[in-house]
C-alpha cells in the first residue's frame, strides 16, 4: 500500500501561514482579525488531518505578514498555533503566540450595557492569567470575564 503525501492546501510563494489552529476555529480567526479585508489570495484548510491534534485548521495569506501583536493575539484562540513567514516558498521565520498583556480591536465586550456597544470606540481588554483560566477586563465598563465568555460573544 502506498501513501500519497501531496499537500492538501496549495503552497504559497510569499506570505503567512497560520498552522495548528484548533479545528473549527479557522473561520472565527478570519472574521475577528479581519483577515479577509484584503485583495490578496487566502487559502483555508478546515478539519485537516494532524498527527498532534487529530484535526486542525490552516490559513495561508499571500503577500501579507502578521505583526508580533497580531501573532500574540492569536494565543486566546489558538495557543498552539505556529505562524510561519514564507518567502520564495521557504519558511524564513517561525513564531508561536504568547499571551499579551492587552488585546485591542479584536474582541467584543459581553456586557450589553458597556459603552463600547454604543460609541465608536475600539475594544480593549486587559489580559489576566489565572491558575485555571484567563480573565479579560474591559477597558470601558471595567467588568472582568472569563475568556471563554468573551470568545463565545
UniProtKB/Swiss-Prot annotation:
<dbReference type="InterPro" id="IPR036793">
    <property type="entry name" value="Asp_carbatrfase_reg_N_sf"/>
</dbReference>
<comment type="subunit">
    <text>Contains catalytic and regulatory chains.</text>
</comment>
<dbReference type="GO" id="GO:0046872">
    <property type="term" value="F:metal ion binding"/>
</dbReference>
<dbReference type="GO" id="GO:0006207">
    <property type="term" value="P:'de novo' pyrimidine nucleobase biosynthetic process"/>
</dbReference>
<feature type="binding site">
    <location>
        <position position="138"/>
    </location>
    <ligand>
        <name>Zn(2+)</name>
    </ligand>
</feature>
<comment type="function">
    <text>Involved in allosteric regulation of aspartate carbamoyltransferase.</text>
</comment>
<keyword id="KW-0862">Zinc</keyword>
<dbReference type="GO" id="GO:0009347">
    <property type="term" value="C:aspartate carbamoyltransferase complex"/>
</dbReference>
<dbReference type="InterPro" id="IPR036792">
    <property type="entry name" value="Asp_carbatrfase_reg_C_sf"/>
</dbReference>
<feature type="binding site">
    <location>
        <position position="114"/>
    </location>
    <ligand>
        <name>Zn(2+)</name>
    </ligand>
</feature>
<dbReference type="InterPro" id="IPR020545">
    <property type="entry name" value="Asp_carbamoyltransf_reg_N"/>
</dbReference>
<protein>
    <recommendedName>
        <fullName>Aspartate carbamoyltransferase regulatory chain</fullName>
    </recommendedName>
</protein>
<feature type="binding site">
    <location>
        <position position="109"/>
    </location>
    <ligand>
        <name>Zn(2+)</name>
    </ligand>
</feature>
<dbReference type="GO" id="GO:0006221">
    <property type="term" value="P:pyrimidine nucleotide biosynthetic process"/>
</dbReference>
<keyword id="KW-0665">Pyrimidine biosynthesis</keyword>
<feature type="binding site">
    <location>
        <position position="141"/>
    </location>
    <ligand>
        <name>Zn(2+)</name>
    </ligand>
</feature>
<dbReference type="InterPro" id="IPR002801">
    <property type="entry name" value="Asp_carbamoylTrfase_reg"/>
</dbReference>
<comment type="similarity">
    <text>Belongs to the PyrI family.</text>
</comment>
<dbReference type="InterPro" id="IPR020542">
    <property type="entry name" value="Asp_carbamoyltrfase_reg_C"/>
</dbReference>
<dbReference type="Pfam" id="PF01948">
    <property type="entry name" value="PyrI"/>
</dbReference>
<keyword id="KW-0479">Metal-binding</keyword>
<dbReference type="Pfam" id="PF02748">
    <property type="entry name" value="PyrI_C"/>
</dbReference>
Amino acid at each position: 500500500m502506498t501513501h500519497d503525501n501531496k499537500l492538501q492546501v496549495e503552497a504559497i510563494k510569499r506570505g503567512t501561514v497560520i498552522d495548528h489552529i484548533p479545528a473549527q476555529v479557522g473561520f472565527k480567526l478570519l472574521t475577528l482579525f479581519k483577515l479577509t479585508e484584503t485583495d490578496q489570495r487566502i487559502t483555508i484548510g478546515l478539519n485537516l488531518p494532524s498527527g498532534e491534534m487529530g484535526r486542525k485548521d490552516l490559513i495561508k495569506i499571500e503577500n501579507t505578514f502578521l505583526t508580533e501583536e497580531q501573532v500574540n493575539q492569536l494565543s486566546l484562540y489558538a495557543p498552539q498555533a505556529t505562524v510561519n513567514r514564507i518567502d520564495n516558498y521557504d519558511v524564513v521565520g517561525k513564531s508561536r503566540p504568547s499571551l499579551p498583556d492587552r488585546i485591542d480591536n479584536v474582541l467584543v465586550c459581553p456586557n450589553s450595557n458597556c459603552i463600547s456597544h454604543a460609541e465608536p470606540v475600539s475594544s480593549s481588554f486587559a489580559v489576566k492569567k489565572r491558575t485555571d483560566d484567563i480573565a479579560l477586563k474591559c477597558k470601558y465598563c471595567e467588568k472582568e470575564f472569563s475568556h471563554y465568555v468573551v470568545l463565545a460573544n
